[in-house]
Design a protein with these regions (language model features):
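PLP-dependent amino-acid enzyme catalytic core
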Residues: 1-113
Length: 113
């Protein structure tokens, strides 16, 4: 059985592996496709930049699992993705959110860590 960290790494590796959908009703004369980013593992359209930031931070040695606390000011999607991946990979995360943030988004962030 794989470790939790190994499973988390597999989740992060799947970021960007999202479906393409042809928009044939909107553009009948041209082949136009949309990439469905909300199908990323975190459910956030900001999964790519969030996973990139964590990956680059680890490569540079600025982030160390189980030692580093990630701090992010967020108003939504980036925080959702960062909290999902950071928690999965063993980072503590603290988020600064605006008062006007929806209760639903606050609940997602609390659930993620």
């Amino acid at each position: 059985m794989q470790s939790d960290v190994s499973n988390a790494e597999e989740i992060v590796k799947n970021v960007g592996n999202t479906p393409l959908v042809r928009l044939n009703k909107l553009f009948e004369q041209k082949e136009i496709y949309a990439k469905i980013e909300w199908c990323n593992p975190s459910g956030s359209v900001k999964a790519r930049p969030a996973s990139w930031m964590l990956n680059e931070g680890e490569k540079d040695g600025n982030l160390v699992r189980d030692k580093t606390t990630v701090i992010e000011p967020t108003s939504g999607n980036t925080g959702v993705a960062l909290s999902h991946f950071a928690k999965s990979l063993g980072y503590k995360i603290e988020l600064a959110v605006p008062e006007r943030m929806s209760d639903e988004t606050k609940d997602i962030l609390k659930t993620n860590g």
